Structures are given as structure tokens and as C-alpha cells.
Design a protein with these regions (language model features):
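ASCE P-loop NTPase helicase motor core
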Residues: 2-161
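Short, charged/polar "capping" segments at the starts of alpha-helices
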Residues: 35-36, 109, 203-205, 353-357
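Residue-level recognition of short, solvent-exposed, well-ordered loop/turn junctions
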Residues: 68, 94, 230-233, 249, ...
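Conserved helicase motor core of P-loop NTPases
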Residues: 105-249, 254-263
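C-terminal accessory regions
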Residues: 252-382
Length: 382
């Protein structure tokens, strides 16, 4: 919400006018969802880094087969870029190519090795910080201020609290009750909200536990309701694997509808304003759906991990914060969570846990990118 999309459009416009259009630029992102979001925001076709480099599954980025022959490469969501991915990009661009990385170094680190964005900033690579927040609602004063100031804060007492950024105080034992009551009411009302959790399993407010409970509260099983495995007609689901046949990406959230009787049951996924349909019984019998295409891989999405939410936006987010999961509460995780919200953040738990998260900085990754680059600058072997 800081004007990044406008900046991308301006950069591309400048290059369009200065070089031949066929070799002007490539827009890319680390994931399919991020690439599609970039395309939708700018109206300019974007690709995954994997696709731009011609990387095949399970291969190393340095073994990519495609050269990028443009004068400009713009990579969005650069906090997700691993050291190997960056090496693949730099290994396959022309010597006179400009590489522009856009991202937030305060968000979660990449899944792969390295801390690329922060390391490049330490090396003094030319950079611009967009500090003004525009995405948050004008009425969400505290949320807007907290998102902008969070990287510089160290104590929950420095946060601004109002109706747009609030804490529902609760003991760990009743966090699931309070959170699910609030979330279920909002889901049933059709609000654009998302429950986020720092943990996937093992606690009462893990993604697994919250999904089971919220499914029962928001979409209870009845004698008339159709099911498919753990899914029920009307469930909120997330796509967990890119599927080119259905043009959906890992991270897409939609609603699953199940209709018909055996052997003619049909599943329809409503996602991003389109409908994706397949024959359930064909999948169960043959392992494939329409035209032998694999069906979408799905999971319940009433609750998601903060990692899964990266790159997405919601009007409101609800998140449990408890000392019971203190080992998983990090500064960049909490920051990533609150920056997913455009209007409202509701934390359910206690201030001690919020404070712990704000003061807990992940152990630094030893990628040696900074040290080796500095040695090369001095003319020494890295």
C-alpha cells in the first residue's frame, strides 16, 4: 500500500520509450500467485522467476536453460527471493541489464537459503524506501500508523490502539473460544477477513485446530449437505499447488461447491470471480479429472499460517498471540500478519505475547553474501 505498483508502472513506461519494445523488460515474481497479482495490478504480463529462467522442477536455478535478453528485469515480492534464485537471475541476464528488486525486508524471510533483500541493503545497493501507507483505510488511523512505524518499534506500549488495531485480552485456554466466536460471526456475514496463526499444528489455536472448529461453526455438516473427503459443500478452501489447466495458483482462496449424487458428483471451485469444475467420481476412480487433468490440490482456509498469507490482502485479520507459542512469535512474522490487513487487525491473547514477538528477531542467516561481496570489492578471492 505504499505506491509500489505505481512505481513499477512508471519504470516500465520509461523503458518502453527508451529501447525497442521486444527487448525492453521482464516482470517476474517468486511465486505463481505473486506473478499473477503483479499482472492484475499493473495490467502488464508478469511471469514466475522459474518460468522466466526456464527452470524445471527439482533442478537448481543455476541449471536454468533460458537467457533473459531484456534491458530491465523487475522482481516483485523480493523478500521471498532466495540466494539460489538471485544467483539464477544474475547468471542469466545480459551485462547491460538493470535488475530492480521490490519488496519489504521486514517481512518473513525466504523459504530457501539466504536473506537476499537485507543483505543487498547492507551492501549499499542503491535503494529507495516508500514509507507512506496508502492501502489502509483513512479511518484505520492506528493500523496505518502501526504498519508504517512497526520496523522501528520495540515494545507493544509504542503501538497505537484503536478500533482498527485492537487486542482482545484472553488467557491461552480461552483464546480459541474467543477467536472462533469473532471469526465465525464475520465469516457468516460475508466479510473479507482471514484468521492467521503462527503455528500449523499441536495447539488449540493452530491452523489445523482452528480450521476444524471454524468449519463446524461456519459450515456445519447436515444430512443434506454434500461432502468430498474432509470438504463440505460451501467450504472456504485454499489451493496448495499451482495448476495450469485450471489457471489457479498456490495460495488462491475460494469457495468449494459440491453437487450431484454418485457417480455424477461435481465439484466447483469459485475463485477470483471464475468457476473451475471437475468430476469428483472420475478423480476418485482414475486419479484425474477433465481431459485427464489433475484436480486442484485443496485445503481448508478458514485459518492460514502467516507464511501462506504472504502476498495477500484482506479487510481484516484475526490472529492468536500467546506465550504458549512464544517460540514461533517473531517480529517479522507479526509485522507480515498485520500488514495483510487494509482496515482492521484483531489480536486475541495477551500483551506479553505481543511484546515477545516485537522483541524477538530471528537468528541471522549466515549466507556470507555480504562478506564475499566485500572481498570481491577489495580484489580478493571470495
Amino acid at each position: 500500500g505504499s505506491g509500489k505498483t505505481t512505481l513499477i508502472e512508471a519504470i516500465v513506461h520509461c523503458f518502453r520509450g527508451s529501447v525497442d519494445s521486444s527487448e525492453a523488460y521482464v516482470l517476474a515474481a517468486p511465486t505463481g500467485k505473486a506473478a499473477r497479482n503483479l499482472t492484475e495490478r499493473t495490467g502488464i504480463e508478469a511471469r514466475t522467476v522459474h518460468g522466466a529462467l526456464g527452470k524445471v522442477p527439482d533442478a537448481n536455478f543455476l541449471d536454468a536453460v533460458c537467457w533473459i535478453r531484456t534491458r530491465l528485469v523487475v522482481v516483485d515480492e523480493a523478500s521471498m527471493v532466495s540466494l539460489e534464485m538471485l544467483a539464477g537471475i544474475l547468471n542469466r541476464v545480459r551485462r547491460n541489464c538493470r535488475v530492480v528488486l521490490l519488496g519489504d525486508p521486514n517481512q518473513l524471510l525466504s523459504v530457501g537459503a539466504g536473506n537476499v533483500l537485507s543483505d543487498l541493503l547492507k551492501l549499499g545497493v542503491p535503494s529507495i524506501f516508500l514509507e507512506q501507507q496508502y492501502r489502509q483505510s483513512a479511518a484505520a488511523a492506528a493500523l496505518r500508523q502501526n504498519v508504517a512505524a512497526f520496523p522501528k518499534l520495540s515494545d507493544e506500549r509504542e503501538l497505537q490502539w484503536d478500533d482498527s488495531f485492537r487486542l482482545l485480552s484472553a488467557d491461552s485456554k480461552i483464546i480459541p473460544d474467543l477467536l472462533c466466536e469473532e471469526a465465525a460471526r464475520r465469516y457468516r456475514a460475508g466479510e473479507s477477513i482471514q484468521v492467521l496463526s503462527p503455528v500449523r499444528v499441536k495447539t488449540g489455536f493452530s491452523v489445523q485446530a482452528l480450521n476444524t472448529r471454524l468449519q463446524n461453526e461456519v459450515n456445519p455438516l447436515t444430512a443434506e449437505k454434500q461432502t468430498w473427503g474432509a470438504f463440505r459443500d460451501g467450504d472456504r478452501v485454499i489451493v496448495t499447488q499451482n495448476n495450469s489447466y485450471y489457471n489457479i495458483c498456490n495460495g488462491d482462496v475460494g469457495v468449494l461447491y459440491i453437487r450431484g449424487e454418485k457417480p455424477h458428483r461435481v465439484a466447483t471451485l469459485a475463485v477470483r470471480g471464475t468457476l473451475k469444475t471437475w468430476q469428483i467420481d472420475c478423480v476418485e476412480k482414475y486419479g484425474a479429472a477433465n481431459d485427464d487433468a489433475p484436480p486442484p490440490q485443496l485445503a481448508l482456509a478458514y485459518a492460514l499460517t502467516v507464511h501462506k498469507s504472504q502476498g495477500s490482502q484482506y479487510d481484516a485479520i484475526l490472529m492468536p498471540v500467546s506465550m504458549a507459542t512464544a517460540k514461533m512469535l517473531y517480529r517479522n512474522l507479526l509485522y507480515t500478519a498485520i500488514s495483510r490487513a487494509g482496515r482492521e487487525v484483531i489480536l486475541v491473547g495477551n500483551r506479553e505475547a505481543v511484546n515477545t514477538a516485537m522483541q524477538c528477531i530471528p537468528y541471522p542467516r549466515k549466507s556470507k553474501l555480504v562478506a564475499r561481496t566485500n572481498l570481491l570489492r577489495l580484489g580478493r578471492s571470495a
